[in-house]
Amino acid sequence: MQPIAPCNRSAEEEGEAVAVSSRHPWPRTDHNGCVPTKKKPQVTAAAARRGELLSTAAEVFAEHGYNATTVRRIADHAGMLAGSLYYHFDSKESMLEEILRTFLDELWDGYDSVLASGLGPRETLEALVTESFREIDRHRAAVAIYQKESRHLVAQDRFAFLADSQRRFEKAWLSTLERGVAEHAFRADLDVRLTYRFVRDTVWVAASWYRPGGRHSPEEIARQYLSMVLDGIAVRE
């Protein structure tokens, strides 16, 4: 008995393929003698819609605050019924978690690349600041949520990853500043912890006023910011 091979079919014919019955383990053929194949699921459209809903939810959380935001409010902004939103997410907590995890994962991809590049302390500081402003450009609403809500969210087991990320932030920035002092790139009398807090807060607060697509790119804002900060902490020649 000759094996049955799939036939070459058009996209329209592929969509009409017949599923193999669980009661008949051998492949059944269609009227052309072809092995039927299942239509591939359209995952890209669903993923795109999910991304749109997360973007909408992030803007609502950032504007109204997490506690004051309901699933219905998010659904209203997305132009859909609240029940339809549950098709994509089981709760507003799951939406917020995904928003924050996506932001932090992308941020740490950039930070880890900078920290592994072997740059000097001044160049590392410049690169970390620039990467931070790029993340504000990509995830402005998520940064605003992180700034306003993380202190309260870390008490929940679901958001314990925020505390872990904060510890990584502190270690990365403090080690860079301490290395700069040790290598005489930064002033010897620099209070590294105070400087870290100043830089951290003044960078992230930009999410409250920065709007993507404005007259200044994130790189330009980073250059302007660094010109002020580095004039204050760098060793004067």
In which residue ranges do the predicted regions lie?
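Helix-turn-helix
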Residues: 52, 56, 60-94, 98
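Short coil/turn segments at alpha/beta junctions that flank glycine-rich nucleotide-binding fingerprints
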Residues: 63-67, 117-118, 139, 183
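Hydrophobic alpha-helical connector segments
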Residues: 98, 112-142, 192, 196-199
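Amphipathic alpha-helical packing segments from all-alpha helical-bundle domains
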Residues: 105-112, 138, 156-183, 193-197, ...
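Amphipathic alpha-helical segments used for helix-helix packing
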Residues: 124, 137-157, 208
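Amphipathic C-terminal alpha-helical segment
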Residues: 134-138, 145, 175, 179, ...
